[in-house]
Amino acid sequence: MKHSTLSLLICIGGCFSACSPTNEKVNPLTQHEDEITNIIAEMTLEEKINMLHGKNMFSSAGVERLNIPDIEYADGPFGIREEMEPHSWNSLHLSTDSATFFPTGSALAATWSTEMAYKYGEGMAAEAKLRGKDMILGPAINIQRIPTGGRTYEYLSEDPLLSGELAVNYTLGAQDHQEAVCLKHYALNNQENMRGFVDVKVSERAMREIYLAPFEAAVKKANAYGVMAAYNKVSGEWCSENDRLLNKILRGEWGFKGIVISDWGGTHSTTKAALGGLDVEMPNDRYFGKALLDSVQAGVVSEKVIDEKVRNLLRVRLAIPAVPKEEANTQMTPLPAQQQIAYEVASRSIVLLKNSGLLPINTEKVKDIAVIGDNAVRHMATGGVGAGVKALYEITPLEGLQKAYEGTNVKIKYAQGYLPQERSSQHKRNSSETASSEKEIREKSERLVQEAIALAKEADLVIFVGGNNREVETEGSDRKNITLPSHQDELIQSIAKANPNIVSVMVIGGPVDLQTIEKNSSSILVSWFNGSEGGHALADVLSGKISPSGKLPFTFPIKLEDSPAYHLGVYPQQQPERPRDVFVDLVNRDKFRAEQKAEADYAEDIFVGYRWYATKNISPLYPFGHGLSYANFQYSALQAKINKSQVDVSFTLDNIGKMNAEEVAQVYITRPQSAIERPAHELKGFQRVALKAGESKEITISIPLEQLCHWDEKKHGWTFEEGPAIIRVGSSSENLPLNTEINLINVYKPQ
């Protein structure tokens, strides 16, 4: 009997029930149960086992005898990775596997746009299909717990609602277009240092309300097809064999019907992993190959367990039409439609932190622009450890400005300004490096500074493009601090003495210390690792073609010690003398030593990010949700009404400026008489609104009452607390000019 894969459509939408999100629409993964039962009945035990581990670096096997195609995985949540050799990390060097470099996760989150998240998933799906892929290894949706996190650039935000809504729409965008997603990294992979062996100790409430929430939303509201188990341990158990996380919560409570795969090299056992909920070991068969076959034949693992894992795989396989191998990689991947999506995300992600009048650039006054900084010309599609994109092209900030002012009387000149920090320079120099080479580096750095100063003196405007790069922010290790590398603080001070008219552009993925930049810049923008079209988007914002509309997806602290985990002394943990990383060792073909031990104490509990700063009255440098505009917005006429199972928050938003622009309105809720410990306020709704100059709109943001529940650790379930609630509305977590009170009495009873 031959079986063909079927094309299915995801059901868009969803509702909330019993204080957690759910989807009452049909789940495409459960539409072929009888057919799957028949397929499993035809399979041998060996064929079943062969599906449960990596066939090569980025695929797991199907069953050729039954015409069941392999599942092909697409690495990289912000662009489809180049094709690799079957059993190594070496590139195949094809001419057709370039891809669009989409803005990274923190950039997408800075759009605060569910529409952009959907388009992002759609764009990723289109390119994955051209490459013959079935499942995107993304989105990466771990909460940004620490400012120094190595993968903060890849993750979304510090807030579970913002991360969850974006994850839901990314998932829908991809799966509506016949490409599965794999949510990662489940769960509590919130640091890179020691991630391969660290044991996370977290309260049940914090785990449920903060860290699991984005995963739960994407599973329940978008029927995510895949989940990747994280490297770390939670409460003493590896995530890849964690019965509580994988069986009880993910499948038992949330109703997940897809596949659970290990992170690469992140499987630690055969029997425990098989019984603990792991479906696929990647990228090899160390535990789920012959060892698993032997366990089944010995009666240690029931064949029914194997059948259920195969069922999970076949559900995904039948929901996602396979691309015939002869059609994959036959044309260049990046297409104009995806490039346009990359531009739209980038242009909406740019955050204006400060503006003293230099922006937008006034070409009546500005004729000579000095662009200074290595990041003005540096490509960010690759670098460091982990996923990168073989981008067909990447418009740098300098190229974007040159194109924007091409054919005008504005002259643009460039100076490097500083030597970039490379991976090798982050470690102690080896003894073979001579004093003369150190002297050469110092002399070159000083020469670059003097060239930058000279150029600044001649210019009407200085655009300093600094920040981090992908060598500084990288998988496998967290940053030691949030100080700008390469002596950028000293450089900006020297430039300011030569020319005070400075616009600073920070190309970053995570928070940095901007105190010196703030003091020496008239205007500051955050432009992120912003993809193939990042330079064009930045130039359009600088020139005033569009108004900046991004909002910070995380808090910028004044100093690192203000952030919760650092303040409480629970991060960084004491590292082994020679710390190892499971992924880095896998790439280097070196055996990972999992016997190393460390604990991560989440002592801040639910007080992550802005929840901490607001509750502890610690002023940040720039708050969560902050972002200015070239327009001016006015909030007024707030009303809040309970409407059946939701709170409808209505207000008027006016653009009283002279430029068309977009604003992200944010709704926070305070519970002033709560019997439990709560943050000063929590984000419960947001909406991006486009307004023409002088335009006014009535805005309504609906908040499901279930979203106001908290996790009761005594009852081990969601609980709705009655009593007063203060609704706060504004443009950031610290700028909330409107507030009103409602009474939540006899309005909702959890099922």
Per-region residue spans from a language model:
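Short beta-strand elements
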Residues: 735-751
